[in-house]
Amino acid sequence: MAPADGESSPPPHVAVVAFPFSSHAAVLLSIARALAAAAAPSGATLSFLSTASSLAQLRKASSASAGHGLPGNLRFVEVPDGAPAAEETVPVPRQMQLFMEAAEAGGVKAWLEAARAAAGGARVTCVVGDAFVWPAADAAASAGAPWVPVWTAASCALLAHIRTDALREDVGDQAANRVDGLLISHPGLASYRVRDLPDGVVSGDFNYVINLLVHRMGQCLPRSAAAVALNTFPGLDPPDVTAALAEILPNCVPFGPYHLLLAEDDADTAAPADPHGCLAWLGRQPARGVAYVSFGTVACPRPDELRELAAGLEDSGAPFLWSLREDSWPHLPPGFLDRAAGTGSGLVVPWAPQVAVLRHPSVGAFVTHAGWASVLEGLSSGVPMACRPFFGDQRMNARSVAHVWGFGAAFEGAMTSAGVATAVEELLRGEEGARMRARAKELQALVAEAFGPGGECRKNFDRFVEIVCRA
């Protein structure tokens, strides 16, 4: 409702709706914190909506990181997770299903009311949220507020999800026979093969919870989003991808990598938590001589592939730092850990401060699952990559790294010891690797320019703040 003549408009109240699984909520919180800081002069307040378990994890991470406390104009608001109280142990896919069913059945509307109550009755003027929680679109419309979704993955993956119906019509039941066919008839996707598409687009179980979720999201975004935040920066996406998205979503706002928005979100590079001594170990290694290996917190190779990877790292002769969950250590080759520790040639740890590691001058190669956050962290650190994708959008990301941007290589299928040794040697010392290393440095410079004073990402984030706060 507009204020009467002579009355001033109340300050903006932005509801930020999280998808409380994996790293989604943490990424959205980094944006919310940057938004809260930028919008403070307008008197804006933000309500960050997530489940109890998600908020507990965020609070724990904040307490462990200096400077990561909430701004005074940003509050946490707990929302139900949709699970029956009697269910004590619920698998994550089922948790996602229950959460999204609750969201679609009017849950988001109730959450916005909870945000209003927590803000002393202040009406929600804009709904910013993880794009996965697409029911927020209707809830925002009911509240008379615009919906501004945040996409956390790559632009090419978003394009694939939006074009899912057209891709299914094109590929039909021939996905298995056309795995290497380029998607040349689909604007923005001509550099990608059928096999690179995310799970559930043209193959796999279309009714699996996450596949249903992103399909519905892809249908909802073009008709309901007032603007869409993209986790990329101008100059990274090829022109055909940018043009295809702009035709479907005319108000895209690219200002990624999101972790660079606030200096304190990068604080772990200055004084990182490093309980396993990764940085001290790196300090004893040659410049650009170390291969860093990590597949994130979800993906993990099979035991036989882990053994091949371990053998390949040893055969490469390069020092390596490997972040690997401890429950996978028993699958490593006999004596591998002892040999690495005894010679000082390798360090295997259950966790590493990844951004700080990638920025260390001793790291010259990154063996990764090609999750989008990891790709951006490696890219913004100028480190070439060897990608072993497993699921989701990782195959598209690996294809982008190797064939679109050219600052790395991609394994086709499972890793072998010979393949790992060759990839690591090439990235660190090879002639083709020199080209990849140079390309990685070019992209690193583009990121630095985009986030420097007057850079395009800074300008775009200012535009995002204006869109969110003008309602």
Curated annotation (Swiss-Prot):
Which gene does this sequence derive from?
BZ1
Give, as in the UniProt entry, the pathway in which the protein acts: Pigment biosynthesis; anthocyanin biosynthesis
Q: What does this protein do?
A: In the presence of other necessary color factors, this glycosylation reaction allows the accumulation of anthocyanin pigments.
> What's a single GO MF annotation on this record?
anthocyanidin 3-O-glucosyltransferase activity
- Indicate what this protein is called per its UniProt record: Anthocyanidin 3-O-glucosyltransferase
Binding positions for UDP-alpha-D-glucose? 152, 352, 354, 369, 372, 374, 377, 393-394
Residues the record marks as active site? 24 (proton acceptor), 130 (charge relay)
Q: Which organism is it from?
A: Zea mays (Maize)
Catalysed reactions listed for this entry: an anthocyanidin + UDP-alpha-D-glucose + H(+) = an anthocyanidin 3-O-beta-D-glucoside + UDP
